[in-house]
């Protein structure tokens, strides 16, 4: 009789074997994902800490035969304390983002997945240069990941004097990649990131030596998110156990509820404990599994909790959304809205939406859809996303005045939450959650109504212009009558007065109507009136 052999593997080994789970499914996707992870970290190190971001992205081909590319991303953020660097880049699932506040990343995986992918196809380590704010030194690291142990391997660590008071982080990775297939997605990612962060500046140099610079348009940075306590609706049995273990010493369960959760005060705590049949003074360490299960069940069914706090969220804001849309698309109309906070499964979320219409936007069979989650542009897996579903399937755009078969329309939706329901660890599409889907539709309906008002008023103005332009052709007759009235019977004076009045009336009318039609002007000037 044969026996099965059982073994365990580390998180690093798991993601090395399954890179597609983190978005590293092929050489093109790996290059895009690496740029994305590094840029997200750079933005979290800057705008979250009220620093105007200056971000450099440089991609170079260093080994044409093996198709090895060098990716470098540098920011002017808060920097990383040197004792944190090894684990931050060399230990999978080690992160500063396991807190209840909105962050661009959420799994403690991103850059480590890029390092793992890098190690699979070439020998160079990840290179990190960093200096925390007010640090007197700049630190240099060369690192790899010990896949079996899920621990960093420090190959080099040095430091130099920080003579210019620089602060920030520069990360360099080498990886097997496909620039030609990744190029469009990377350009799209950088552009869409800039649309919602016009307070940042981006310098991007690609392997073909093309350089793009997106300049900073404003000094206004969105309010950063704050860390909050968990909401009772979002708890489970294991979370309660973890919170109890984390406490330095046992405390009465009543105090535990009041001090460790939002939306629970003295009265609410007493009600919960009464419903769960638990004594107020029982110590947390004395709770049995059955009692914890009972407590969680009561908390989930309790109806009187206040909604989760939105302090943990950071919206883009209507002004910045409109500024970004106008700067990239140059539309004739742009509008945005930020909805009020809502919650799903105990997690707060806010939906923002923006619309740009007309102007320089190219007509297309479907709206151009810009999807964002926690200020991250979502580029891949578009049609599996709930945002795409609402924009293309649930919105009847003709109801809002858009009658073109190929409308010049851009629709932007941003979801921010302490827990975005991504479909996978690759973080490229948002799952269908009823509460979120409803808010997306309501947000789009809000901005679409503003677009409808604009289109309706524009059409009325155009109709009025057409009627008034018809009346313009009477200017010569009116000028003739006024000339006869003003100067009497002197033909020479009548002719001069007629020409002068005709030009003045024509100029006033054209300016008033904002008509720029040279052919119409000539037609009016050459109009033959009855002999003066």
Stretches found by the model and what they are:
Residues 14-36:
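Conserved short strand/loop->alpha-helix "switch" segment adjacent to the catalytic nucleotide/phosphoryl-transfer site
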Residues 28-57, 110-117:
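Conserved ATP-binding N-box helix of the HATPase_c
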Residues 60-71:
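Short beta-strand-loop-beta element adjacent to the nucleotide/active-site pocket used for signaling
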Residues 75:
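Acidic ATP/Mg2+-coordinating residue in the GHKL
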Residues 79-87, 114:
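Short helix N-cap motif at coil->helix boundaries in the Bergerat
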Residues 148-154, 177-189, 193-199, 209-242, ...:
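Charged regulatory segments coupled to nucleotide-binding catalytic modules in large multidomain enzymes
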Residues 254-276:
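Helix-hairpin-helix
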